[in-house]
Amino acid sequence: MRYAIMVTGPAYGTQQASSALQFAHALLNEGHELASVFFYREGVYNANLLTSPASDEYDLVRAWQKLNTQHGVALNICVAAALRRGIIDETEAGRLALPSANLQPGFTLSGLGALAEASLTCDRVVQF
């Protein structure tokens, strides 16, 4: 089956993002296809390059990035939600005259169209 995941919880403070990542790995281990992960609302914090957990804590942001590099899973974050929360890429930083970007490599700023496309092309969309 072809799946998409929507994450609405931040990297730290709730179980939503870590549960979504565990679910993603379970899907891939069982031979399913994971087309994309869409980060919405507080979920956009999963793409913050500046997140720096303690050395004895799990680095969820880099774990998402690893999912992207190892399995080619698209990591889309809602551009409107990201901008409201200070998550920006180089293009937006330039457009808004901000000193730097903080979007973790592997993540892409996307509109809700990416989520709509996933819901049309996947067998299941699972929200965390």
UniProtKB/Swiss-Prot annotation:
It holds the Pfam family DsrE. Its main location: cytoplasm. One of its GO terms (molecular function) is sulfurtransferase activity. GO terms for cellular component: cytosol; sulfurtransferase complex. Keywords: Cytoplasm, Transferase, tRNA processing. One of its GO terms (biological process) is tRNA wobble position uridine thiolation. InterPro entries: DsrEFH-like, Sulphur_relay_DsrE/F-like, Sulphur_relay_TusD/DsrE. The active site is at 78 (cysteine persulfide intermediate). It is found in: Cytoplasm. Its EC number is 2.8.1.-. Belongs to the DsrE/TusD family. Heterohexamer, formed by a dimer of trimers. The hexameric TusBCD complex contains 2 copies each of TusB, TusC and TusD. The TusBCD complex interacts with TusE. Part of a sulfur-relay system required for 2-thiolation of 5-methylaminomethyl-2-thiouridine (mnm(5)s(2)U) at tRNA wobble positions. Accepts sulfur from TusA and transfers it in turn to TusE. This is Sulfurtransferase TusD.
